[in-house]
């Protein structure tokens, strides 16, 4: 009798448990799969990672797959080919594609950062650093035509320094490999994103002497974009995606660097919590993140001015052709 009761109890428990996996499967199936290809995986993009880790994309019905493209050109290729529904990169790339005659051109719908996120790293501490110190130096720079390099050159020109004549900028090293090259002895200075800048400091081979974000002023550095056809066919997904990002932005703007670091730490398993906190603090103090995701027309004009100054603009593009603020405005309500 005892065995019979035990068997019945086990059977009852098993039967009761069956609906839960089924419900979980139904919930998972109801989420829309979206692939986001990001230009780099950096703490610079903390609001995005906060949105991922806090489940905001799932709340908006999105099963987000995050892929790192390691360069804006590669992100754009992924979006145009359909390998990614959404790209996260410097919006200058959308201008290049448009001017090259893309039929189904890629449109920006949300701006995440409003300052450059890279830093100038020297081989020794330079508390009295001046941009003139770069004259005659070898600097490990970024890809020609990319935002990191153009903003760097924009700052140089603001200080009456000719990027071609007054210093040597090495643009031959792949994105993501400059820190290793600098650590190995190449260059007098290097332009680095985080966590590479802090890693060089911890290694004792480099010292941050200037912030390109501070010295360049407010710049529409990185934004989210998708093919115009995809946005027309899936406005609900774009809106849900933007809503999730706005929640991430709200979280970052209302919490301390320590709290933010703890939330996004799973995204950076190779960095300890103290390092992540230091980097978040550095970005927060220079007013990196906007309060909303609206890509203003003045920002787009400034972006084209920077491209023009760098000699990378073949023709001005109308703001309304490559930017929509509809989704960001709705998310900010």
Which sequence ranges carry the predicted segments?
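Secondary-structure end/capping motifs
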Residues: 232-313
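Short, low-complexity disordered leader/linker segments with a strong preference
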Residues: 1-33, 330-333
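Pocket-lining segment of extracytoplasmic ligand-binding domains
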Residues: 93, 124, 174-268
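Soluble non-cytosolic domains of exported or imported proteins
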Residues: 42, 69-73, 88, 142, ...
């Amino acid at each position: 009798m005892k065995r019979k009761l035990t068997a019945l109890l086990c059977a009852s428990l098993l039967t009761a448990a069956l609906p839960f996996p089924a419900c979980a499967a139904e919930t998972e199936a109801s989420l829309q799969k979206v692939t986001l290809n990001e230009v780099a995986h950096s703490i610079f993009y903390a609001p995005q990672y906060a949105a991922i880790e806090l489940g905001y994309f799932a709340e908006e019905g999105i099963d987000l797959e995050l892929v790192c493209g390691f360069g804006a050109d590669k992100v754009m290729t992924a979006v145009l080919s359909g390998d990614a529904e959404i790209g996260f990169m410097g919006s200058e790339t959308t201008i290049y594609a448009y001017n090259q005659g893309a039929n189904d051109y890629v449109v920006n719908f949300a701006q995440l950062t409003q300052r450059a996120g890279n830093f100038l790293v020297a081989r020794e501490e330079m508390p009295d650093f001046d941009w003139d110190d770069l004259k005659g130096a070898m600097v490990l720079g970024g890809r020609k035509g990319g935002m990191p390099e153009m903003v760097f050159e924009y700052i140089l020109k603001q200080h009456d320094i000719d990027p071609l004549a007054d210093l040597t900028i090495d643009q031959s090293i792949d994105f993501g490999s400059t820190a290793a090259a600098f650590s190995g002895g190449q260059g007098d200075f290097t332009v680095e994103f985080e966590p590479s800048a802090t890693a060089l400091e911890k290694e004792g081979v480099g010292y941050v002497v200037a912030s390109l974000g501070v010295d360049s002023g407010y710049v529409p550095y990185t934004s989210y974009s998708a093919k115009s056809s995809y946005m027309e066919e899936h406005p609900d997904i774009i809106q849900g995606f933007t809503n999730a990002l706005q929640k991430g932005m709200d979280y970052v703007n209302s919490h301390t660097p320590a709290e933010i670091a703890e939330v996004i730490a799973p995204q950076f398993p190779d960095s300890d919590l103290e390092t992540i906190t230091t980097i978040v603090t550095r970005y927060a103090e220079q007013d990196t993140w906007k309060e909303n995701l609206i890509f203003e027309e003045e920002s787009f004009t400034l972006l084209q001015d920077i491209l023009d100054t760098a000699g990378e603009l073949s023709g001005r593009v109308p703001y309304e052709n490559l930017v929509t603020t509809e989704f960001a405005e709705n998310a900010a309500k």
